[in-house]
C-alpha cells in the first residue's frame, strides 16, 4: 500500500458510499463530483473520509494491508475494514493491489452500471423465458470478484443482475445485463 494506491482506492470508495446512500443509484465516474475525500495515510492503517458535498454525510473507511488487520470501529465508520490484498479474493471489502496500479474510475473505459430492483429483475427473467416455459435463456455471467460487484455490494440486498450502459453513436444508449455468479472456495 502506498499513497498513490490509496488515492485511487478513495475514488472506488466514493462509489461504494453512493451505493450505501442509494443502492439503486447509477454508478459512473461522474459520481466522484458529488464527494470529497480526505486521506490520512499511514503504513499500518489508512483512514479515508468520504464526504458528500451537499448533505455532508460522512463515511470513514479504514484501509489495511492483508498482513496487518487490526480493525476497531471509529465514528462514522463504514462498518467493515477495507483490505488491500496481493491477489484477487472473494469479499466486497478486499481489493487486490493490481486494481490500484492505475486510476480505473477516471478512465474512459470505466462503465456506467446499476443494480436492478426486484421488479426489473422479474421483467428480465420473464423476457428470458422461452415459448414452452421449460427452458430459459441465460445472461452472460460475471464473477462476484469483479470490481463492479464489489462496488454494488449491500449486505441486505442480494445482487443478481447488473445492468451496464454504453453510449453508441448510432443507436444512443445501449444496455447490457449480466448475471452475478459466486466463486467457489
From Swiss-Prot:
- Principal subcellular localisation of the protein: virion
Q: Name one Pfam family in it.
A: Pox_RNA_Pol_22
UniProt catalytic activity: RNA(n) + a ribonucleoside 5'-triphosphate = RNA(n+1) + diphosphate
The protein's UniProt keywords, in alphabetical order, are: DNA-directed RNA polymerase, Nucleotidyltransferase, Transcription, Transferase, Virion
- Primary role: Part of the DNA-dependent RNA polymerase which catalyzes the transcription of viral DNA into RNA using the four ribonucleoside triphosphates as substrates. Responsible for the transcription of early, intermediate and late genes. DNA-dependent RNA polymerase associates with the early transcription factor (ETF), itself composed of OPG118 and OPG133, thereby allowing the early genes transcription. Late transcription, and probably also intermediate transcription, require newly synthesized RNA polymerase.
Q: Which family does it belong to?
A: Belongs to the poxviridae DNA-directed RNA polymerase 22 kDa subunit family.
Q: Would you tell me the protein name for this molecule? A: DNA-directed RNA polymerase 22 kDa subunit
